[in-house]
């Protein structure tokens, strides 16, 4: 009974220490939960978004354009999903826009705010630029001398990290954005570039596919999704959050444990006579060790309970 009464008295005598240790525990657990939830959330959202919107396995360009009537043959021969993607870069005063013609099979865009396009004078634009430059739904943007009404914002899987060029170091959402318009409006721009998107199946011969494409159409550039920063940055950010979560989970409690060890060690030295008296009263070494261990566990238990509540 004597030892049990000492718990409350010890806490009162060393209140500032117990409060500080409990606060450190609370901070460590909260930071862990926040970063862990953020990391797993980003990872889960990205993976599902990639699936829903048919993320590419690779993008490539060629010196010789692949005829449209060859696409079906390529898909059958190599057991791949293959699509020619049309786009055009347009420089306007204060911004640069990359307008895409809508894909049907690979790297589909998803309107996340507002509505999709339905008329030739409407566009949807990438969400990052809209938020950065305060472009509201209903505003009008000029593209190649014609005004288009913004009807919504979108994301697409191969541009979740908005790099204008794949070898850029930093994203650009202040002067560069993506846009979609109707096919007829896109055709009216009268200027277009193309690149090719491919999704391999489990039994696709990737090496043979690339070899044949190069022999027939002379590949200019080839970028696999695992080397595409616009895509991999999502996983990289998720991993960064998860690493930080476990760094907080281990480092802050270690600091707390070190502080507790110092304080409890000093307390044991100060109470040597009392420990001797308690031993004489019949308390075993094991009971005394448990007593001081409980004193050390109080801050951690208190912090854990506070976070749980």
Feature-to-residue mapping (PLM):
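Hydrophobic alpha-helical transmembrane segments that constitute the membrane-spanning cores
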Residues: 251, 295-309
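Juxtamembrane/interface motifs at transmembrane-helix termini
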Residues: 40-41, 276-277, 308-309
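Interfacial "coupling" helices/loops that link adjacent transmembrane helices in transporter permeases
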Residues: 9, 14, 258-298
